[in-house]
């Protein structure tokens, strides 16, 4: 396959792929009248159960429409949340998600799935204003939020991400969008990848990509070794930063670029003169954690927890996904050390609480519909994933 390349990156022998190779989606006309009509039905359905409301506004997104409602005086918010099944029945919707209240507003949000969903293409996100503003090499495309804005996620500030969702909910498409974003935006000198794919079918397409530190790992036992290597590399980088007197990878690389790093006299283990190298970011992607936990649970958990606790400062970041969000896969230690979560549709309320520590993921409609819970946020953001 021949891939069209763009111009050479300044100061690098590499050229980034041309944005033209990514598919763009067709423009989609919004049916505002149909959305308004459903808003009227929504108010009537609530009034039939004795809850008087006023429709403040509505936001039409690619997957759902959010109706913002103010309730009458003396009406408890819990009255509305208890009527979710009745609301879904009145609107002939598969399910609805209720935000009571919308964070920062004196209104209740009711999210109703659109009759026709809009396709969100990765090419659209990477061509957006938000992508052009992105400066960090680990900012990746995720999708569009409920207001239609492109969402770029900075994995460096997360600094690690835990993804969970049922089979077919869109986890692998999301991971592919993230990896493709790295390949489209950065050169191998800046970001390196370790891809762990026990399912054997998702990561094979990246074989031979220059960003890879090793071929995609499909054997769960070898995957445990790859994670252990990442731990050793983290420790080596801390040793280098300690000797050079820098707190993190940003300060070290800036000093390297300025030419401020002077290696001490002497030879390394191979008899070569000691030198300092620029440290690339390393992104470790695990596409199915449950398979690894079945084979080497203790080793895998130890490596993931050590990386999650310490690796941020030296530029090593984790993206860990599983289709089985149970406590024997997403253990308490792993959850405690990876505060950023991305939840796709799950089968039950219990699964939603394992991944998000709150309800909501059981109300998602699948096919890339997700909730992003940032490391310092208590209210998840609803996003339609890019494809």
Regions found by a protein language model. Give the residues of each.
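Low-complexity, intrinsically disordered P/S/T-rich segments
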Residues: 1-160
